[in-house]
């Protein structure tokens, strides 16, 4: 074992490089500054991040918090050496969970843990986090970088994100007026997003394809297409919420797919009737289903299958809400409707067939 000078071991001898950490902080400062917004204009490096809620323009706010990770999508990033977009995924997974409650994301903090800190790799990850924050309109006000030799092997790392938002009191979602006959709008996903990647990786392994091989489900390599960042729906949804006042509920379609996520925002006497014929799944989902022999029901409870977010609106307001979302860049379609259900019936029922 090496020793540094006559005073014995150093922290660096144990595998923790403080200088590398300081270098990474300098590299990420411009990215952090790029996320400033009303309420947050400080520098990183303090013991805690600051946010001025009054400067954000709220009069009687309720704070909403969420935290999440990116799951084993990170293994593809590590194996493929592509680290510049997982930060966007990290932000998306948190802020999309805020906006479904009607909250505007205000600030974000990240946790980055690795066995051996590479300042350039870390800076690329944080650059992605900053890009996600800018897209969501929230400030990156702090974070933690933990170099933990012995806890993670090789170039492995993990990420966790923490987001806080606010909504005016009385404007939180879901609203209490969801009714039979209400329309369910679907918002298209950008791809697999950040759920189901243990199954994705298993299927890719069975296929024999390398990460840098041309993808059979689109233009680009397998890794590039599977690393497509999770879509951030925040700004279009906030615009629709504020302009129309007609959105009754939103559900972020993440782990558990339709059957686990949609019922979370519905009153117990109602179920979501989903028209599977209305969904146009991206080619990646057909490839996953066919290559892995994954049944349609398993696809629907594992992946978003092309629908990353749903909105519940009254039938008379559906066209107006869809128009605002489309104007803001979303692909929107009628996915289903609200129907009555008995106490022991599932909260999601299907008609038609998923085109995979």
UniProtKB/Swiss-Prot annotation:
UniProt GO cellular component terms: cytosol
Pathway where this protein functions: Purine metabolism; IMP biosynthesis via de novo pathway; 5-amino-1-(5-phospho-D-ribosyl)imidazole from N(2)-formyl-N(1)-(5-phospho-D-ribosyl)glycinamide: step 2/2
Gene3D superfamilies on file: PurM-like C-terminal domain (3.90.650.10), PurM-like, N-terminal domain (3.30.1330.10)
One Pfam family recorded for the sequence: AIRS
CDD domains in alphabetical order: PurM
Catalytic activity annotation: 2-formamido-N(1)-(5-O-phospho-beta-D-ribosyl)acetamidine + ATP = 5-amino-1-(5-phospho-beta-D-ribosyl)imidazole + ADP + phosphate + H(+)
The keyword Nucleotide-binding appears for this protein: yes
Top EC category: ligase
GO biological process assignments: 'de novo' IMP biosynthetic process; adenine biosynthetic process
Keywords carried by this UniProt record: ATP-binding, Cytoplasm, Ligase, Nucleotide-binding, Purine biosynthesis
Enzyme Commission number(s) of this protein: 6.3.3.1
Highest taxon of the lineage: Bacteria
Compartments it resides in: Cytoplasm
ATP-binding is among the record's keywords: yes
GO molecular function: ATP binding; phosphoribosylamine-glycine ligase activity; phosphoribosylformylglycinamidine cyclo-ligase activity
InterPro entries, A to Z: PurM-like_C_dom (IPR010918), PurM-like_C_sf (IPR036676), PurM-like_N (IPR016188), PurM-like_N_sf (IPR036921), PurM_cligase (IPR004733)
PANTHER family noted in UniProt: TRIFUNCTIONAL PURINE BIOSYNTHETIC PROTEIN ADENOSINE-3, TRIFUNCTIONAL PURINE BIOSYNTHETIC PROTEIN ADENOSINE-3-RELATED
Similarity comment: family membership: Belongs to the AIR synthase family.
Name of the featured protein: Phosphoribosylformylglycinamidine cyclo-ligase
Source species of the chain: Sinorhizobium medicae (strain WSM419)
Lineage: Bacteria, Pseudomonadati, Pseudomonadota, Alphaproteobacteria, Hyphomicrobiales
Gene that encodes it: purM
């Amino acid at each position: 074992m090496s020793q540094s000078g006559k005073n014995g071991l150093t922290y660096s001898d144990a595998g923790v490089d403080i200088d590398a950490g300081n270098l990474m902080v300098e590299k990420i400062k411009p990215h952090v500054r790029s996320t400033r917004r009303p309420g947050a204009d400080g520098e990183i490096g303090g013991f805690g991040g600051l946010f001025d809620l009054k400067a954000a323009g709220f009069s009687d706010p309720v704070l909403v918090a969420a935290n999440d990770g990116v799951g084993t999508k990170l293994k593809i990033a590590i194996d493929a050496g592509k680290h510049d977009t997982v930060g966007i995924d990290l932000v998306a997974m948190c802020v999309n969970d805020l906006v479904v409650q009607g909250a505007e994301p205000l600030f974000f903090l990240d946790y980055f843990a690795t066995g051996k800190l590479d300042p350039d790799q870390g800076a690329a990850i944080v650059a992605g986090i900053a890009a996600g924050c800018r897209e969501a309109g929230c400030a990156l006000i702090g974070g933690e970088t933990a170099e933990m030799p012995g806890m993670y092997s090789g170039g492995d790392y993990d990420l966790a994100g923490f987001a806080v938002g606010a909504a005016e009191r009385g404007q939180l979602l879901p609203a209490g007026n969801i009714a039979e006959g209400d329309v369910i709008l679907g918002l298209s996903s950008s791809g697999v997003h950040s759920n189901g990647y243990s199954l994705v990786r298993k299927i890719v392994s069975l296929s024999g394809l390398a990460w840098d091989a041309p993808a059979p489900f689109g233009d680009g390599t397998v890794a590039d297409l599977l690393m497509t960042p999770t879509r951030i729906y925040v700004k279009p949804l906030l615009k629709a919420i504020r302009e129309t006042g007609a959105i009754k509920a939103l559900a972020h379609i993440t782990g558990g797919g339709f059957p686990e996520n949609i019922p979370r925002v519905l009153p117990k006497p109602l179920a979501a009737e989903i028209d599977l014929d209305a969904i146009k799944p991206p080619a990646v989902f057909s490839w996953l289903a066919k290559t892995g022999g994954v049944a349609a029901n398993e696809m629907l409870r594992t992946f978003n299958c092309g629908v990353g977010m749903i909105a519940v609106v009254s039938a008379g307001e559906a066209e107006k809400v869809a128009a605002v979302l489309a104007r803001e860049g979303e692909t929107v379609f009628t996915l289903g409707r609200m129907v009555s259900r008995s106490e022991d019936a599932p909260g999601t029922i299907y008609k038609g067939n998923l085109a995979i």
